[in-house]
């Protein structure tokens, strides 16, 4: 767990200036760059330019997160996308959980800049009926119990909050609505990793995404040994190698013969 005020290197933003292909990584709600840092370092080691920003309100205290909303988080990843697009010839966007939702929104609003999408346990909806009470509950209670640490592999720490700020959670549901509405705008190649046992994001989001996008090249990979934070779990090596192959495939044609 991330204690209040704790600051360690793994929760800081990560940037690597590599070759002409860039990858933007977006972390999830109440999480931090720590959940994606090994993935970022793997991609950097393969020569890609990498951006892993820290979303506003994250990596400090849950109270800080509760005074932010989805437009704040989106603007941060949007800046990173535009920065990568200035430095690179092609960009692939990837995300974990809410980060996957942000990645989809970037592809919807900046389609020409996004060559492909890699989503790990993305969330765009939920069957949890308790969320129906959020419009009122967010005004009565500041937070609820957190959902961090859903990792099967012992000894892993995603550096996330142990409380869920309810105003911020309500804002996230508004982002879900926008992304679901515009799913048909997604035409980019898409690789979706889904954990068979996920105790944070239920099974409703993946089929909504896969049936809603217009991508002719969309694939789902089921992870059998990992929980929600699969990027720190048993199947992380599969995600790292599979996403690297995906990035190479969707960017190779345009960049063939260019230095890496």
Where are these regions (language model features)?
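Active-site nucleophile loop of the alpha/beta-hydrolase fold
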Residues: 118-128
């Amino acid at each position: 767990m991330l204690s209040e005020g704790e600051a360690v290197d793994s929760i800081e933003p990560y940037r690597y200036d590599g070759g002409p292909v860039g990858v933007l990584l977006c972390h999830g709600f109440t999480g931090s760059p720590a959940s994606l840092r090994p993935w970022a370092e793997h991609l950097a080691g393969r020569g890609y330019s990498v951006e892993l920003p820290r979303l506003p309100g994250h990596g400090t205290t849950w109270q800080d997160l509760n005074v932010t909303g989805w437009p704040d988080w989106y603007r941060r990843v949007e800046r990173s996308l535009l920065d990568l697009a200035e430095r690179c010839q092609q960009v692939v966007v990837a995300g974990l959980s809410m980060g996957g939702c942000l990645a989809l929104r970037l592809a919807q609003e900046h389609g020409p800049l996004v060559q492909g999408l890699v989503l790990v346990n993305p969330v765009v909806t939920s069957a949890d009926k308790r969320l129906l009470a959020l419009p009122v509950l967010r005004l009565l209670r500041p937070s609820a119990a957190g959902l961090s640490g859903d990792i099967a592999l012992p000894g892993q720490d995603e550096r996330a909050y142990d409380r869920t700020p309810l105003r911020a959670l309500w804002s996230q549901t508004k982002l879900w609505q926008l992304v679901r509405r515009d799913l048909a705008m997604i035409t980019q190649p898409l690789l979706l990793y889904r954990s068979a046992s996920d105790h944070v994001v239920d099974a409703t989001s993946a089929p909504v995404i896969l049936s809603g996008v217009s991508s002719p090249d969309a694939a789902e990979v089921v992870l059998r040994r990992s929980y929600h934070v699969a990027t720190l779990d048993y199947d992380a090596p599969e995600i790292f190698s599979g996403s690297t192959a995906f990035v190479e495939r969707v960017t190779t044609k345009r960049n063939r013969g260019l230095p890496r």
